[in-house]
Amino acid sequence: MSKSASRARLLEIIRRRSFGRGEVTLASGRKSDFYFNLKPTMMDPEGATLLAELTYEALKDEGFDYIGGLEMGAVPLAGAIAQISWIKGHPIAAFFVRKKPKEHGAKLAIEGLTRDETLAGKRIVVVEDVTTTGGSAMKAVETLREAGANVSLVFTMVDREEGAAETFAAAGLPFRALYKAREFL
């Protein structure tokens, strides 16, 4: 399937499985009359594959060492993208950032790394399923920067176009999206 056909097919899947109308309160606290819940698309075999392939194709030539983001939305994305990257012969390792470090066990804020593995100095792309203001992704960025990571890009599946670009620009971060909310409205 061509890139444009894959993109059109994924848009259909997101529209059917993950887009809805009706008043909701977003993670940002804002009210909206439409919403995206990408989890049904991320858990669908075709949807997960298309999300991973299209994201991998958008990122493969940029030299990222790791891909990940804030739990929960980034977990299935990062895992699927890492798998596709291995299959395509250009592996990008995955991780995720906990909203709050575990209070037991290793008490980690960043999961997916071995004990002797570090993100310090590594080129990182932070991925997110849906971005509104950018606040959730910035939590991951802050944790990663504290760990010494070089966060080089924030990449979202759907940008609601409600301030995220400005948030990331103010933090000196490039921001890209697979889709814009207006494509579904």
Swiss-Prot record:
It is an enzyme of class 2 (transferase). GO terms for biological process: 'de novo' UMP biosynthetic process; pyrimidine nucleobase biosynthetic process. 5-phospho-alpha-D-ribose 1-diphosphate binds at R98, K99, K102, H104, E128, D129, V130, T131, T132, T133, G134, G135, S136. Its EC number is 2.4.2.10. Its cofactor is Mg(2+). Homodimer. This is Orotate phosphoribosyltransferase. It comes from Bradyrhizobium sp. (strain BTAi1 / ATCC BAA-1182). The lineage of its organism: Bacteria, Pseudomonadati, Pseudomonadota, Alphaproteobacteria, Hyphomicrobiales.
